[in-house]
Structure formats: C-alpha cells, structure tokens
Amino acid sequence: MNYSALITLAQKLIQQPSVSPNHHSCHEIIANYLEKLNFNVELMRFDNTLNLWAFHSCKKQQKHTTLLFIGHTDVVDPGDPQFWDYPPFSGLVHNNMLHGRGAIDMKGALAAMLVATANFIDQYPNYQGRIAFLITSDEEGSGINGTTKVVESLIARNEHINYCIVGEPSSQDQLGDVIKNGRRGSLTGQLTIHGSQGHVAYPQFSKNPIHLIIPALSDLLNITWDREKSILFPPTAIQITNIYSNHKNNNVTPHTVILNFNVRFNDKCSIDNIKRYINDIFTRHTLPYNINWKLSAEPYFSKPGQLTNVAINAIKYYQKFEPRLETTGGTSDGRFIAKMGTEVIELGARNHMIHKVNEYIDLIDLKLLSSIYKKIIEDLILIQ
C-alpha cells in the first residue's frame, strides 16, 4: 500500500475550502486521479452542485459484480479560524495526526477509497468486476442536487449496483468497531404559536405565546412514539432545537413564538402518526398554531449479505475483533442507493471529531482504513 500517496491525496483534498455545496476543485483532483487509472469519468451538474460518477472494468462485454464507493467532498463551515490550533484548510500533519476540516468527514475516507482502488488495480490489472465512485458536493447541505439526482440518472440508464460502501465516519472507539447498515428517518418541524402583543406591565391585555406554549412542551417531550419496539432501529425521539420570538424589546410581549424541532423516527412510527401526535397536543391545549414540515429522509435498512460478511472479515483480519452492526446516528446518502436494491454499508473513520473545531484523523487510522477497503475489494471482486 502506497501510504505516502494516501497522505498526500488526503492533504490535497483537505486544502480545498469546499464548504457545502462548493467542491472547490476537489472533483477535478479526484477526476484526474481516476482518469490516470483509466476510469470512465462523468461530471454531472445539477443546479449549483457538481457530482462525479466514474467506473472501471477490464472486460467491457461481460456483466460484472459492481462495487460502488460513495463519498462527499463538501464540508461544514469551520467557523472562526481563531478557535483552531491550525488553519482549518491547512491539511497539516503534526504528531502523526492529519488536521483540517473534512479530515474525518469525509475527505480522509475518500483518499483511503481512491488509493485502495489504485493499489488493487495495480496488483490485479486483469480482475473481473467493476469498481465505481459516486461523489457529491451536496451532502452536508440540502442534498437536493447531490447523490439522489445521480441515482435517478443511474436508474434511468438501468445501471445495476451490487454492493455499496459509504465512507461516512461510522467507527466509535476504534477504527472499524461499528458498521452502519441503516439509519432512522428525519422529520423537521417549525411550529408557530400565535398570541397577541402587549405591554409586559399589563398582561391582562395580551396573550404571551411563550407562556401559552410551556404546558404543551411537557406533553410534547413525553409522547410515546413507537407502539411496539423496533428490532432494526433505535427508538423514535424528538429534540427541540430552537425557541425564539422576533421581538427584541424587553417591555413588550411577542405576537408569536417559533419552535423548531426534529424527530428521528424508525420503522414503527409513520410520518402520518408523528404529525397526528403533535397536532393532537396543540389542539388539546387549544393553542392557535401552524406547523411547517420538512421530510429530510425516511428510514432505510440494508439486510446484511455478502458485502457485510466480507467487511466484517476484513476488519477482523486487521483489527482482531468483530464489528457491531448499528443503525444509529444521522442520515446519510446510503438511503438513496438502497432504493436500487443494493446492499449498503457505511464504514469509515472514528466519529469523535466530526464537525468539531480542530478536526483531525490519526494517520494510523487513515492507513488502516485504506487497507481494509482494499481487502474488501479483493474479497468481493476476486472471490466470486
């Protein structure tokens, strides 16, 4: 394994300030890398988002087992650089750590996938199979013009993907200790409670919507969402993310109060039931309200199969332990590929520094991740 090339590529990607949905030359870097490996590379632009679809096979006339790697080049905003020990887009290596925004989520994994693939093709130039990449710059943002649009195009072309590895940071305490094979759904709501504005010294002449909402919040947080326990996912849960009014004077009660919340839901709690439970509470409290809903993702679950078994064995080979299969955490682009009937796993770096100031990846983990990816390719493609 060419580890110096791995570190150099990861640094080059991290040094691009690709805050979502801007890829900021990352896709050109990756396209050039893949073209040197004789990949067929296609750049797909949808509105403000650039996506990359690429594939490589040795024998074009045969139907091949296809292994797809999915990743994203966009990152979340690093915030004020003064809070970072090193510039967030420096890609600096210090004390065996590669520093920078995206080191974990997920430019490190992208570099690991690419170098693993390059080493595999170099070692097995006449392999029978197909390796593909789908890379977007719109995963951390809206996701509207990213992976989902590319998948729609692939379905229209009758592309068949057997296996898919998403490079999201799935690991927790040790690299490879967790493989994700599904995620809960995500439903966001913005609730507006209507009152009437007035002077704080004369509450009898106004209806303070902040006071009105307080009794209902306790009921909201104590909803029994799941009528039976899911064997695939964690329980459905709600989190209130913001409560605010647009009024700034301390001697005036506001006309409205706005509450933002998010529900992560499993297969035992439907979207319709979530809306009904929440509407029932505010109706029961006789509050004048309206809710704007946004569905970000429905739950997805990928039944463990050949890819999962191969990944488990690859991790056991290098780490000497067996990983856990989980469906915890946030949403991922794996849900779009799962619609194609593809076996999907998420396997990547440790997630302890995801979206945090001073994000970094241990170089030992980066090298190990690339080695695990390469062994998965070998065991899936060569042993058919």
UniProtKB/Swiss-Prot annotation:
Catalytic reaction list: N-succinyl-(2S,6S)-2,6-diaminopimelate + H2O = (2S,6S)-2,6-diaminopimelate + succinate
Family, per entry: Belongs to the peptidase M20A family. DapE subfamily.
Keywords: Amino-acid biosynthesis, Cobalt, Diaminopimelate biosynthesis, Hydrolase, Lysine biosynthesis, Metal-binding, Zinc
Cofactor(s), names only, from the UniProt record: Zn(2+); Co(2+)
Lineage summary: Bacteria, Pseudomonadati, Pseudomonadota, Gammaproteobacteria, Enterobacterales
Entry function: Catalyzes the hydrolysis of N-succinyl-L,L-diaminopimelic acid (SDAP), forming succinate and LL-2,6-diaminopimelate (DAP), an intermediate involved in the bacterial biosynthesis of lysine and meso-diaminopimelic acid, an essential component of bacterial cell walls.
Keyword Metal-binding on entry: yes
Assembly: Homodimer.
Catalytic activity, EC: 3.5.1.18
Cofactor binding, note field: Binds 2 Zn(2+) or Co(2+) ions per subunit.
Any one Gene Ontology molecular-function term assigned to this protein's record: succinyl-diaminopimelate desuccinylase activity
Organism: Blochmanniella pennsylvanica (strain BPEN)
Full protein name: Succinyl-diaminopimelate desuccinylase
